[in-house]
Amino acid sequence: MSGKVHGGKGKSGAKDSGSLKSQSHSARAGLQFPVGRVKRYLKRNAAGRTRVGSKAAIYLTAVLEYLTAEVLELAGNAAKDLKVKRITPRHLQLAIRGDDELDSLIRATIASGGVLPHINKALLLKVEKKHK
């Protein structure tokens, strides 16, 4: 074997390991949602002796963060259209049901969400123009 010893200062070039600041899994992945908590939930709810990889937790956390940002953006737009500054369950309902992909993904009933305004065309009065 060669005379090189594995290990050393690490990427930062610090002399002692005490000066390194520990980073969370979320910070390393560049996410806001907690990767460690998602991994813990995955391990707890995994069937039987199923093992959970760390990248699975990171990927799932990124998906959850993206979906949350998407719903909040659409709900914020709905609130802005109604000229209010607070997002309510009604705005969430309008945002989710207004987007086809989110509507098919989230089939849950939103409490205090109301219903979408819709009138069937058959119920509308027909205005016929008289031809001369």
Swiss-Prot record:
A GO molecular-function annotation: protein heterodimerization activity
Record PTM text: Acetylated by ESA1 and/or GCN5 to form H2A.ZK3Ac, H2A.ZK8Ac, H2A.ZK10Ac and H2A.ZK14Ac once deposited into chromatin. Acetylation is required for function at telomeres. H2A.ZK14Ac is acetylated at the promoters of active genes.
SMART domains in the cross-refs: H2A
Localisation per UniProt entry: Nucleus; Chromosome
InterPro entries per record: Histone-fold, Histone_H2A, Histone_H2A/H2B/H3, Histone_H2A_C, Histone_H2A_CS
Modification type N6-acetyllysine: residues: 4, 9, 11, 15
CDD domains with a match to the protein in the record: HFD_H2A (cd00074)
N-acetylserine found at: 2
Keyword Secreted set for record: no
Region (Disordered): 1-30
Keyword set, alphabetical order: Acetylation, Activator, Chromatin regulator, Chromosome, DNA-binding, Nucleosome core, Nucleus, Transcription, Transcription regulation
Assembly description: The nucleosome is a histone octamer containing two molecules each of H2A, H2B, H3 and H4 assembled in one H3-H4 heterotetramer and two H2A-H2B heterodimers. The octamer wraps approximately 147 bp of DNA. H2A or its variant H2A.Z forms a heterodimer with H2B. H2A.Z associates with the VPS72/SWC2 subunit of the SWR1 chromatin remodeling complex. Also interacts with RBP1/DNA-directed RNA polymerase II largest subunit.
Role, per record: Variant histone H2A which can replace H2A in some nucleosomes. Nucleosomes wrap and compact DNA into chromatin, limiting DNA accessibility to the cellular machineries which require DNA as a template. Histones thereby play a central role in transcription regulation, DNA repair, DNA replication and chromosomal stability. DNA accessibility is regulated via a complex set of post-translational modifications of histones, also called histone code, and nucleosome remodeling.
Name of the protein in question: Histone H2A.Z
Originating species: Kluyveromyces lactis (strain ATCC 8585 / CBS 2359 / DSM 70799 / NBRC 1267 / NRRL Y-1140 / WM37) (Yeast)
Lineage, highest ranks first: Eukaryota, Fungi, Dikarya, Ascomycota, Saccharomycotina
Gene: HTZ1
